[in-house]
Amino acid sequence: MTAAAASNWGLITNIVNSIVGVSVLTMPFCFKQCGIVLGALLLVFCSWMTHQSCMFLVKSASLSKRRTYAGLAFHAYGKAGKMLVETSMIGLMLGTCIAFYVVIGDLGSNFFARLFGFQVGGTFRMFLLFAVSLCIVLPLSLQRNMMASIQSFSAMALLFYTVFMFVIVLSSLKHGLFSGQWLRRVSYVRWEGVFRCIPIFGMSFACQSQVLPTYDSLDEPSVKTMSSIFASSLNVVTTFYVMVGFFGYVSFTEATAGNVLMHFPSNLVTEMLRVGFMMSVAVGFPMMILPCRQALSTLLCEQQQKDGTFAAGGYMPPLRFKALTLSVVFGTMVGGILIPNVETILGLTGATMGSLICFICPALIYKKIHKNALSSQVVLWVGLGILVVSTVTTLSVSEDVPEDLAEEAPGGRLGEAEGLMKVEAARLSAQDPVVAVAEDGREKPKLPKEREELEQAQIKGPVDVPGREDGKEAQEEAQLDRPGQGIAVPVGEAHRHEPPVPHDKVVVDEGQDQEVPEENKPPSRHAGRKAPGVQGQMAPPLPDSEREKREPEQGEVGKRPGQAQALEEAGDLPEDPQKVPEADGQPAVQPAKEDLEPGDGGLHPRPQAVLSEQQNGLAVDEGEKAEGVPPPGNAAGDTGQPAEDSDHGGKPPLPEEKPAPGAGLPPEPREQRDVERAGGDQAASQLEEAGRAEMLDHAVLLQVIKEQQVQQKRLLDQQEKLLAVIEEQHKEIHQQRQEDEEDKPRQVEVHPEPGAAVPRGQEAPEGKARETMENLPPLPLDPVLRAPGGRPAPSQDLNQRSLEHPERPVGRDPAGPPDGGPDTEPRAAQAKPRDGQKDAAPGAAGTVKELLKGLEQVPVPDPAREAGGPEERLAEEFPGQSQDVTGGGSQDRKKPGKEVAATGTGILKEANWLVAGPGAEMGDPHMKPKQMSRDLGLAVDLPGGAEGAAAQPQAVLRQPELRVISDGEQGGQQGHRLDHGGYLEMRKEARGGDHMPVSHEQLGGEEDAAVPEPRQRPEPELGLKQAVPGGQRPDNAKPNRDLKLQAGSDLRRRRRDLGPHAEGELAPRDRVIIGLNPLPDVQVNDLRGALDAQLRQAAGGALQVVHSRQLRQAPGAPEES
């Protein structure tokens, strides 16, 4: 399994990407419903069932040889099974899309409403969903080929999920993961939530649609490999889900809502997480819509074929494509607007379509194909149970939503912004109430400490209480928890209303004024509901420590003061707390008790009745919750009423408190208030300091995080720039190497295009290769030349020419055709890049035509014959090019090719002097202008095309030319520059008469133009030499490299022999051919001289090479023919 995981990690990552989705947001909610232990066990069980169902599909596919889910169903149960699978798949993906919309509405509406200053509500949520679907989802979904980008987006979504998990873990640490407070607040096993959570768990692992595509993508498909891949993937996902569920539940306990992200306090990190998560979900829509659309198309429009199978879903008509996309996008959008919470849609979808696709269908298919399978029976019955019971349970719970989840949905989701603002208000109120208390204390006389004890819980500032230290600790803990406290508040506690933002101070002041008459004051039902934590247990006066805790907590949560009073006064009111509605079937009070109990030990230095202790614990916990709950718990998302209560900010309780204490403010209460406020001022100052410290710490952390992010971003930018530079350098180096390598292999091994221009990089290697080739017999060259197309491969010089032709789009078009005579098609491809050449070619065409006339008169050696046919083809295809550069040369080559075939060596010699004499003379005047133009823009291959046309046409015309041309164009462009300098040198050297050395050196830069031309010039001699070895070399041609090496040596020798002839005879043509490249640097007269010298040099090196190549080409010509 490990080996498979290591070798198939890419597949595992893709599967994890496809499994993990929005359902991860509901994991803490499911853990709250089932308890930590039972939730984890159910996750493991669902993971095992998913693995079994995937293996059912793989085994069935291996036996039936089917490779699609629907195909397996059709194989097992016919059209009915196929229809069931397709319908279930469509429903599953539609449900997932609706869940996506719900999450976007939850996360986006609050953020954007706060950003633009709108009121969060149903209207804004609808507008947001419509805008997202119209601007993001629809454009992406209308793309036919988005899978590559979609996969990158899905990877981005996975990144957000990972960040989300770490945020959850940090949140749990902040909420006292190691303090142990959560131990009594959480539940471990709750059987009543099993059937509501199993469908969500089952759907959260849904990956059956990815099984068969993954199976097909394996190099060696096997059941064992698939088992290991999916086992690894499911293990990763299970671990991820358990961590998110556990830490999320510990962080928010009973306040946990369906979408955990709703609980986090508003800060830069959490807002970025929300927005990023929302955008990743929006961009992930096409992942669901693409397969859904395809399934709909096949279900509605697919026709059964004669053989009983169905055509694989292929191209979809545009109209149907758009219609299905629009219907899916906007249909699911309406569903997202109508369904308020994500756990409901995920539960319904998972219970129906999810159970069918994930468990029932795979088990049925496997059971039909494998007669006896116990595991399939288990999975089948569990799936059926989920389908029936979970559907009923989910629907029944959704009916109760008005009391419970309904409040969470509208209050926690639609009114999340308000809830968050209330949370912030609660935090501020914790400080503001303290200030208010201080003000009230100023106006009122201090009361005895007895009153303080009773009222301290309300006042938030315990004064002179022996338990103060404990209270301080509790306050500090509460404050620490405050930012994201989210301590689970039982549904009953939802009735605890945090003070309304605007009324925080006023409420607190009035409450304090009215606090004194707590005895006279009737316990508010809200207070009782808060007391629910006590569960109807009467709360005797809380110990000072508890009161201190309550006071700071109440001070922080403006609501707490009145509530604490209500609790103290309602210590006799166990009924109200009991009355508190239970959240998700759990009595709100119990969690409160559990939460309070852990803290009670520390808070109650004095032993008290169990009820009093529980009440104290509840009060403390509530205080802590108030501190921490303000953001999440009181956000109204935590409890059924929180939305409304939080909306009022605890106004309902406050009014009750106000009237009760308002009944009459005895002087004692005022004095007590003064005393309490004195202590309250201290407590308030302490709370404020603690709060400020927390805020400062938080601000510092945020600042540090921002700075780190900025630094990281800068580093990343720098790295990206460096990478870009490095990539560019690598590309340049790689291109150069490729050019060099391509030149080498093409010149040595393929020599495909004798007339094709060779890139500089290639020319240089060709020069070396030629040297080596000169050392070796030329025979291997023929095989090489033939290697590319089976035809005699063009010589390196020819290749260079062809390469140069692309380089000199203008002047080398003509050269290209002669070289590409046989490779007419390649030339066609080359013709496009040479369009520029064609433009410039017309001028050269005239000169070339003249040269052609001379060349026509000149017989060309046998290689010309071979090349002649292809040249003719090229001339026909590229009349302008062939005529311009090699028009004459190619024609001459064709003629000499024929003549050489007839006359042999004699024709080659005649061709040589004809080419050198008339061809050169004809070419010189015309070639000079051509050379000027070509040298200015490109390396000149015109003469090379004309003279070397005979030998080169064959190789050039052959397929190798294509390669050479492509390379030649790249290398030719570089070669042109080199050619200019090289040609100047060559001209000088040519003038000096050093054709051989110059040709070799210039082969790097001039070989493109110069070498091919010399080939033509020595063609007579080469033709003779090649005529004899040409026939033999073709036989030996296939030991290309060895023969090439030998040929290289022979070529050098031949070049030396031919050098003078080439110089004398080919001088004019050399001028024409080589002059093209050097023309820019040389004047017309100088150009001729330089061209002559260059041609001679090129002839010296190229002609020798051409001999071997021509000889090889000669045998290749018959092959071509």
Swiss-Prot record:
Bilayer topology: Multi-pass membrane protein
Per the record, residues carrying Phosphothreonine are 772
Parts of the chain that traverse the membrane:
4-24, 36-58, 84-104, 120-140, 153-173, 229-249, 272-292, 323-343, 345-365, 378-398
Q: Does the keyword Zinc apply?
A: no
Molecular function GO labels: L-amino acid transmembrane transporter activity
Pfam short name (any one): Aa_trans
Q: Where is this region: Disordered?
A: 434-691, 731-904, 965-1068
- Where does it reside? Membrane
- Keyword check for Membrane, yes or no: yes
* Highest rank taxon of the organism: Eukaryota
Q: Where is the composition biased (Basic and acidic residues)?
A: 439-454, 466-475, 493-508, 544-559, 645-659, 668-679, 731-752, 763-773, 802-811, 863-876, 976-998, 1035-1044, 1057-1068
Query: What's in the keyword line of the UniProt record?
Result: Amino-acid transport, Membrane, Phosphoprotein, Transmembrane, Transmembrane helix, Transport
* Reactions accelerated catalytically: L-glutamate(out) = L-glutamate(in); L-glutamine(out) = L-glutamine(in); L-alanine(in) = L-alanine(out); L-serine(in) = L-serine(out)
Q: Specify where it is mainly localized.
A: membrane
The chain residues annotated with the modification Phosphoserine are 612, 802, 890, 966, 999
Q: Extract one GO cellular component term from the record.
A: membrane
> What is the protein's known function?
Facilitates bidirectional transport of amino acids. May act as a glutamate sensor that regulates glutamate-glutamine cycle and mTOR signaling in the brain. The transport mechanism remains to be elucidated.
Concerning its family, UniProt says: Belongs to the amino acid/polyamine transporter 2 family.
User: Any idea what this protein is called?
Assistant: Solute carrier family 38 member 10
Gene encoding it? SLC38A10
